Amino acid sequence: MKIYLVGGAVRDALLGLPVKDRDWVVVGSTPQEMLDAGYQQVGRDFPVFLHPQTHEEYALARTERKSGSGYTGFTCYAAPDVTLEDDLKRRDLTINALAQDDNGEIIDPYNGLGDLQNRLLRHVSPAFGEDPLRVLRVARFAARYAHLCFRIADETLALMREMTHAGELEHLTPERVWKETENALTTRNPQVFFQVLRDCGALRVLFPEIDALFGVPAPARWHPEIDTGIHTLMTLSMAAMLSPQVDVRFATLCHDLGKGLTPPELWPRHHGHGPAGVKLVEQLCQRLRVPNEIRDLARLVAEFHDLIHTFPMLNPKTIVKLFDSIDAWRKPQRVEQLALTSEADVRGRTGFESADYPQGRWLREAWEVAQSVPTKAVVEAGFKGVEIREELTRRRIAAVAGWKEQRCPKPE
């Protein structure tokens, strides 16, 4: 029996990045031998075991053979005669097909070290094309390592295009697509994930609502980048700088979906695109089974981001109604989330990357004023039933009006 550290732990250590999880491959052993050594078996389809002390995963070396469609149609073979090189060959990218023995020596049968040095994401073998999930994984790796200047090898991108055009991505379940997307949204450069999907044709298949934005013009006065698809990715990039939250980043990604519905004869204007985009947000989220909390914020951002841009022109009643509409009294975090997504929208434009966004500050200040109006005082004043809500709203509007007179500049 020989045990090797494999995959991401080896890769990230070589890149000087923190190692979160460690996976191990066991060569020359059997399930019974592992059980006798105190390991606990957890894999049903192939033998994976948990170490009795560390609880890290130890998998018997195995090979895989395509036996069906999609990413689940594989038959695994695990036996003592499967070599380390056999096991590494089934992996997706050369930088993930690295192993380290107990002496610290790196085993690199597929030039993963060279590709690490050259910052290249390259597939190990043609078997890459048998698993459509790998298209999303490569896009996610490209986003994860974009700050290190990694790029996808030309031949790998070509294979990803072939897989997409062959309809392989249609076998992916919504849950897996969302899981990869969610993971990509946590990276430093999530916009790269969607750009890679567009480069290989997968964006049109998996995210048609986003793909439809490319080629749709916006007024050059407000959008020097002109193309709404480009603006969307720029906005997502800015959101990633402003917030680590997946729901903020996803909502930013979806904020302009309504522009994809504008008839070409009305271009480059997109009047009413915010509310129009709500149904597309719902459509996308229902298809991918996006969690409700993430979906709900995306709907609100699509509907209200343009309203927040015009904050100085809003009367106090409209401002309080906005807080009602986003359910801020029960979910106050939404005020900050809308401020961040709206700021990302404004700064996600060519030449506006460092622009100030006072509307965000005013939104936050108005919220602090409105929510500081005490409900208890209304009740103690003798109001009952529906009158409490009406009086509380009246007092909130009055408080916001007083603040706006002092703090928020009047529109010219």
Curated annotation (Swiss-Prot):
PROSITE patterns noted in UniProt: HD
InterPro entries registered for this protein in UniProt: CCA_bact (IPR012006), HD/PDEase_dom (IPR003607), HD_domain (IPR006674), NT_sf (IPR043519), PolA_pol_head_dom (IPR002646), PolyA_RNA-bd (IPR032828), tRNA_CCA-adding_enzyme (IPR050124)
GO molecular function annotations of the record: ATP binding; CCA tRNA nucleotidyltransferase activity; cyclic-nucleotide phosphodiesterase activity; magnesium ion binding; phosphatase activity; tRNA binding
Record EC number: 2.7.7.72, 3.1.3.-, 3.1.4.-
Named cofactor requirement(s): Mg(2+); Ni(2+)
UniProt KW keywords: ATP-binding, Hydrolase, Magnesium, Metal-binding, Multifunctional enzyme, Nickel, Nucleotide-binding, Nucleotidyltransferase, RNA repair, RNA-binding, Transferase, tRNA processing
Pfam families: HD (PF01966), PolyA_pol (PF01743), PolyA_pol_RNAbd (PF12627)
Protein's job: Catalyzes the addition and repair of the essential 3'-terminal CCA sequence in tRNAs without using a nucleic acid template. Adds these three nucleotides in the order of C, C, and A to the tRNA nucleotide-73, using CTP and ATP as substrates and producing inorganic pyrophosphate. tRNA 3'-terminal CCA addition is required both for tRNA processing and repair. Also involved in tRNA surveillance by mediating tandem CCA addition to generate a CCACCA at the 3' terminus of unstable tRNAs. While stable tRNAs receive only 3'-terminal CCA, unstable tRNAs are marked with CCACCA and rapidly degraded.
Family, as annotated: Belongs to the tRNA nucleotidyltransferase/poly(A) polymerase family. Bacterial CCA-adding enzyme type 1 subfamily.
Note: A single active site specifically recognizes both ATP and CTP and is responsible for their addition.
Assembly behavior: Monomer. Can also form homodimers and oligomers.
Domain notes per entry: Comprises two domains: an N-terminal domain containing the nucleotidyltransferase activity and a C-terminal HD domain associated with both phosphodiesterase and phosphatase activities.
Record's protein name: Multifunctional CCA protein
Primary gene name: cca
